[in-house]
């Protein structure tokens, strides 16, 4: 079991890429309080970045786990719909929003993901566990050769020369 530490801040209706609401105000980025912690799971991301928590949960419809994670320097994962069950809801068949883990690093996130993944017969999108441990498979690719593809513009999107050059230098 887990111990509930507390609740963190989210925007009203968990809608928005900036964590602000009239009741609790704005969640500031812990690395620079002039910046946003992102949203909608900005409170969770800020709590993790400051060391207040080891794990945090969130939901993701349009980046609500991923954006605050990247803005606060932590890790957030939007899992496959059905991997982490929802339980009964009015939108049971919707795969748009998912529950997901957030953590300070990939190792912690994989431990939490192992704990969150389960089957729930009240969630029509839920599926049975495969028996795979995300934590135990973290180093699966460490001794394997693999390639990473990169595109400058997907063949259709214009990209500034400065951005293109910075991307190429980063890849090198």
Can you say where each PLM-predicted feature lies in the sequence?
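Short glycine/serine-rich loop segments
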Residues: 2-116
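A short helix-breaking turn/cap at a secondary-structure junction
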Residues: 78-166
């Amino acid at each position: 079991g887990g111990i509930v530490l507390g609740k963190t801040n989210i925007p009203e209706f968990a809608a928005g890429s900036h964590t602000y609401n009239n009741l609790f105000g704005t969640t500031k980025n812990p690395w620079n309080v002039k910046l946003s912690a992102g949203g909608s799971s900005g409170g969770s991301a800020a709590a993790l970045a400051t060391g207040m928590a080891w794990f945090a949960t969130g939901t993701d419809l349009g980046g609500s786990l991923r954006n605050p994670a990247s803005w606060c320097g932590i890790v957030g994962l939007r899992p496959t719909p059905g991997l982490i069950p929802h339980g009964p809801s009015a939108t049971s068949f919707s795969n748009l929003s998912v529950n997901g883990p957030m953590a300070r690093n990939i190792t912690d996130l994989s431990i939490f993901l192992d704990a969150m993944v389960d089957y729930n017969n009240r969630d029509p999108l839920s599926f049975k566990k495969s028996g795979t441990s995300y934590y135990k498979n973290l180093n699966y690719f460490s001794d394997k050769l693999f390639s990473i593809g990169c595109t400058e513009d997907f063949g259709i999107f214009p990209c500034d020369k400065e951005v293109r050059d910075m991307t190429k230098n980063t890849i090198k």
